[in-house]
Amino acid sequence: MALNKNHSEGGGVIVNNTESILMSYDHVELTFNDMKNVPEAFKGTKKGTVYLTPYRVIFLSKGKDAMRSFMMPFYLMKDCEVKQPVFGANFIKGTVKAEAGGGWEGSASYKLTFTAGGAIEFGQQMLQVASQASRGEVPNGAYGYPYMPSGAYVFPPPVANGMYPCPPGYPYPPPPPEFYPGPPMMDGAMGYVQPPPPPYPGPMEPPVVSGPSAPPTPAAEAKAAEAAASAYYNPGNPHNVYMPTSQPPPPPYYPPEDKKTQ
């Protein structure tokens, strides 16, 4: 746990270039107790913003308080609990130890009160990230930022509570591979094989047009007219035409003899 080592002159929070801000909440109050020799910076109630990174919790106070920033790494925190009192805002409490060169000594009990809400969400995320960090896992959404010459990155104060946005000009980290899955590999045994097209017969030959036939004779025309006149058409069966059977020609006509000649 370090004192006044994670803030900038412009009011932003400073983290290492291998960290990222996972979550932040404004309108948070921080108090300490159970300290033998209470330094001046630990007295009273601190008001500001709390940040969650993959490896620690950082509190950034507002105003001209002697405690400008306060950092608590997970490996120095214990007995963390989320409390929901009947009266008052929800809060997170626990114990933290000082680290070597952190600006103070000993241990202290802390209390983070979320006056505008968010204690349950922040506490659940903090416990999950701390558990992953203890196993050496990289928490979800924890992407490192490009190398900075100073070895740190300055985040401006957040606009609103919730997830902290990426800094301006920094390309958003690529989504995990399972976020935009590509098309599944097709099994060869299940693939659909289109049959080949039928053989092409080639261009069709133009129809053969016979030459002009001989003009019909008057006798043929008369015979056709006679057949058409004697044909029978049935409307119920329009595809068939009934024609009478061929009969022998009638006998020759003889004019009656003149009675006078008889």
Curated annotation (Swiss-Prot):
Repeat found in the keyword field: yes
Biased composition annotated in UniProt, kind: Low complexity: 219-231
PTM note: Phosphorylated in repsonse to EGF as well as estrogen and progesterone hormones. Tyr-192 and Tyr-232 are phosphorylated by YES and SRC inducing nuclear translocation.
One Gene Ontology molecular-function label: RNA polymerase II cis-regulatory region sequence-specific DNA binding
Motif (PPxY motif 1): 196-200
Any matching Pfam family: GRAM
Chain intervals with Pro residues compositional bias: 197-206, 246-255
Location, primary (coarse class): cytoplasm
UniProt keyword annotation of Nucleus present: yes
Alphabetized InterPro entries for the sequence: GRAM, WBP2-like
Locus of motif PPxY motif 2: 249-253
Keywords: Cytoplasm, Nucleus, Phosphoprotein, Repeat
Cellular component GO terms, alphabetical: chromatin; cytoplasm; nucleus
GO biological process: cellular response to estrogen stimulus; establishment of protein localization to chromatin; positive regulation of DNA-templated transcription; positive regulation of intracellular estrogen receptor signaling pathway; positive regulation of transcription by RNA polymerase II; progesterone receptor signaling pathway; response to estrogen; response to progesterone
Subcellular location, record wording: Cytoplasm; Nucleus
Domain GRAM per the UniProt entry, residue ranges: 1-84
Region of interest (Disordered), residue spans: 197-262
Residue positions, PTM Phosphotyrosine: Y192, Y232
UniProt function note: Acts as a transcriptional coactivator of estrogen and progesterone receptors (ESR1 and PGR) upon hormone activation. In presence of estrogen, binds to ESR1-responsive promoters. Synergizes with YAP1 to enhance PGR activity. Modulates expression of post-synaptic scaffolding proteins via regulation of ESR1, ESR2 and PGR.
Subunit structure: Binds to the WW domain of YAP1, WWP1 and WWP2. Interacts with NEDD4. Interacts with ESR1 and UBE3A.
Annotated domain remarks: The PPxY motif 1 mediates interaction with NEDD4. The PPxY motif 2 is required for the coactivation function.
UniProt name for this protein: WW domain-binding protein 2
Gene transcribed to yield this protein: Wbp2
